[in-house]
Amino acid sequence: MAEIINGKEIAESILNNIKKEVENFDVKPTLAVIIVGCDPASKVYVKNKIKKSEFLGFNSILKELPEDIQKEELLDVIKNLNNDKNVNGILLQLPLPKGLDEKDFLDEISPIKDVDGFTTYNSGKLFKGEKPYSIACTPKGIIKLLETKNINLEGKVAVVVGRSNIVGKPVAICYCKKMQPLFRRIPKQKTYLKF
């Protein structure tokens, strides 16, 4: 029997618990968000991230950069945030404008400050079954929803739709030891993955 999970209620509970924890910190955490260009969807995501971080009691820094920024300039912004001892987390909003390849920038973020878990270090730790500093938020949210509802995937067959580095792969990796292996054809690839 299918059950609809109210993610908003669970998220609100988690946020309130985090807010209480942050109130007991000696120093307020600081999140730096970098957005390049003026993609409307990215602007909405960034606005919501800043709003949530401030609700939690975090300081936030928003770096709004022009679409025509040069590679070296963006690398300098990341380097400065890495070196800023007051900044605890860095988030580079994706997608980047045409002409800027995210691969050139994500690994420049310190793994300790990598809020999204997108650096090779953090995603590599996850892939190896080790504990990364951070896991991408959507897979982490999915896992938290399942855990909150006491949904045990051990020994079950589960289909992970998608294979992106942001959602599909991390979800599959997080649960691959608990799920029965499943062969799935990847559209447009003529390949099969075993999860």
Where are these regions (language model features)?
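Short, well-structured alpha-helical segments in soluble
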Residues: 73-84
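Non-catalytic terminal and connector segments of soluble metabolic enzymes
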Residues: 55, 82, 109-112
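Short beta-strand segments enriched in small/hydrophobic residues
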Residues: 28-38
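Glycine-rich phosphate/diphosphate-binding loop of Rossmann-like nucleotide-binding domains
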Residues: 36-50, 133-195
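Positively charged, low-complexity intrinsically disordered leader regions
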Residues: 1-27
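Short beta-strand elements in bilobed, periplasmic/extracellular small-molecule ligand-binding domains
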Residues: 53-67, 182-184
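Conserved active-site and cofactor/substrate-binding residues in soluble primary-metabolism enzymes
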Residues: 5, 9, 13, 44, ...
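Anion-binding alpha/beta catalytic cores of soluble intermediary-metabolism enzymes, centered on
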Residues: 91-153, 157, 171
